[in-house]
């Protein structure tokens, strides 16, 4: 297991734990300061029951979406770390490791890879300070989500 996966695993366990209110408030405010979170669009850190609640916080009000048809809208507050053409079945570098696009996409459905094998890709990196929710500002019906 890559070190970043191990760190994520243990941090996730810690983040889900709900501590006594004064301790949780200290943890939350420390995390906000340490990571440099901009909380202007969110509730005050003291209102979150766990670090995970803070990590997956909701926006107080909806963001305005640019309606220009030529604008590309990101589904996340993130940094695009890679983009390009899928070549030789390798396009994804996640947490320090390369992944086979075919293996990643066919784990649940074998026909997924054929649809994208000559396509393009983008990797979105969400840092610990980023807003960790996804949005799809388009008119469609989601049939399946694989995480």
Which residue stretches match the model-derived regions?
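Non-catalytic terminal segments and appended small domains
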Residues: 1-147
């Amino acid at each position: 297991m890559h070190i970043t996966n191990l760190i994520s695993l243990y941090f996730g366990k810690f983040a889900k734990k709900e501590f006594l209110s004064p301790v949780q408030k200290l943890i939350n405010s420390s995390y906000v300061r340490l990571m440099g979170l901009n909380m202007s669009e969110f509730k005050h850190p003291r209102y979150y029951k766990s670090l995970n609640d803070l990590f997956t916080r909701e926006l107080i009000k909806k963001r305005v979406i640019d309606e220009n048809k030529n604008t590309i809208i990101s589904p996340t507050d993130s940094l695009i770390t890679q983009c390009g053409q899928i070549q030789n079945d390798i396009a994804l570098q996640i947490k320090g490791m390369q992944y086979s696009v075919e293996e990643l996409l066919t784990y649940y459905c074998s026909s997924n890879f054929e649809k994208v094998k000559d396509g393009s890709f983008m990797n979105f990196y969400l840092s610990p300070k980023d807003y960790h929710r996804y949005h799809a500002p388009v008119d469609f019906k989601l049939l399946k989500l694989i995480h």
